[in-house]
């Protein structure tokens, strides 16, 4: 199957190092015809330039991710347009899997699964979102779903793709959503245009880097924009819910604060400050002007292909923890040859496994020979080294090349 040309849009602000790593992973995609647009602040633009990759670079330094995405969308030239966060890295097969699902003419959107900070456990799978902004889990199968104005498949913001003409026609992203629920709003507005595909094997790793709104451990530092977006979402999609005594999505945030306080992850003054930001954000969202969304006008000067993407050979390099320096040296040589490289470096221990994408563009899996990787089944895995390497190689083979 010939894959349609695709544009990947990455919005970045105050995360230059993470952006560079994200772009390095995109350069290893097996999709043969992609362009990458970076919409970023000055530091992000400089980090993108330093990669040496031919990228469309758009300067944007405002705290409004929807407006930034619209800027990138207008400049996109691919038939399909995909989005990934700057603190995420994509498996080499990610984009081709999403675009493969979009090759069906009745599919207008596609979303995949997201692995969390340990690089193995899933952070997000498939779910629907309703008009109240609440999520509802879906089966893990690869399938397509029709949508409705009050309920649609939720495309995860760090792992999704759309038919560009369809997304342009609905006005792209609503700038009233400066952060949070921006994709849920798109999903409900796009629901009548076609099916949404759930593609479990289209995977990214999402690190949840620190930002102005959260710490590196995912504890929030400000809830203003979350509350504002909840208010805007209800005004757009369920205005009758504003008359209710309680707002479920706001109550969920209050429970979140209570849970964090009980776990002693935030202090009482921090909890009070976060609660105040939640209330102020709600008032802001209720007062925020809402304008009709007109179709976006494309401004793309032409398709700027990222060179040397497409299918390539892989390599799995394995060894013991005391061999790590030699393994990484071997991996850098294989990477310089153009391969997608995975290093599996194990210690004689029961430590759980982790996977990371290094600054050298190498997939590094570490942990104990007897530790679990998938967080399923027994924690202690009694297996000889060669069998364990074979098992882990088989686990990753559907996602990235191993030979």
Task: Annotate each PLM feature.
Residues 1-25, 311-317, 388-403:
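N-proximal low-complexity "stem/linker" segments adjacent to membrane-targeting elements
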